[in-house]
Amino acid sequence: MGGSLLSACGGGNLSDDSPATPRLASVDNFRDVAGAAPYPTVDGRQMRRGVFYRANALTLDTADHAAIDRLGIASVYDLRTPEESARTADSLPGGATTRTLNVLGTADFVVPAVDTAAAAVAFMETQARGYVTGAAQRAAYGALLTSLADGPGAQLFHSSAGKDRAGWIAALLLSIANVPLDVIMQDYLLSNVYLALWIKAQTDTLRQQGGDAAASVHAPLLSVQENYLQAGFDQVKASYGTMASYLTQGLGISQATINTLHSRLVV
């Protein structure tokens, strides 16, 4: 792939002197949206690190709390349902404000009852398409992008595992930054690397409870696959024609907001 989902919208030319993003043992899918390198754009520029971070639930231990505090995160956006947030409360970075944006619009996220791996894959693809078509999803993502554009300082958004709800908004930000499509997909799939120990632990538990069959059936729910993100992109094309139309018409954000995000995202 080599194209981008959204044409460039302008931006600054500041140098990237941000510190390396720490690996957090207690929040294993924590990372900089801009990547470790950082990511290149299709027009020869690169993303700016230290602006937006993504994560799974913020179950910070003492050492990781100290590490994340050094990043100066001013705002945290929790994309989970109320019941998810109640079960696993966030440990916020020092001085950060928090806002809940319930992407699913339901009281809780209920793991579906599936009896085949194919059914699990179908559920994940349907969920990805719902990020594009669902009213609650569009409202939450539109509000999040607006807040990310307007908010001062570094900002963090997270879901439970940090791979699906958070993975979609990260893909949107990379699209706004004009990152190549293959890089966007590679970034999406990195959740499988960052969450490897968690995936193994969940798989081992499923195997102990229901044998190899149960572990195999539920495996697609624990990880990300290229076809999940592609299902979302395909739905954008089917429903709105272009990513730009999805952002402005579907999510209700202005071109000025897109321009501001691009300026913040790209060096």
Say what each PLM segment does:
Residues 1-155, 169-267:
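Cys-dependent protein tyrosine phosphatase-like superfamily
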Residues 158:
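Histidine-centered active-site/metal-ligand motif
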Residues 161, 165-166:
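Ser/Thr-glycine-rich phosphate-binding loops at phosphate-binding pockets of nucleotides
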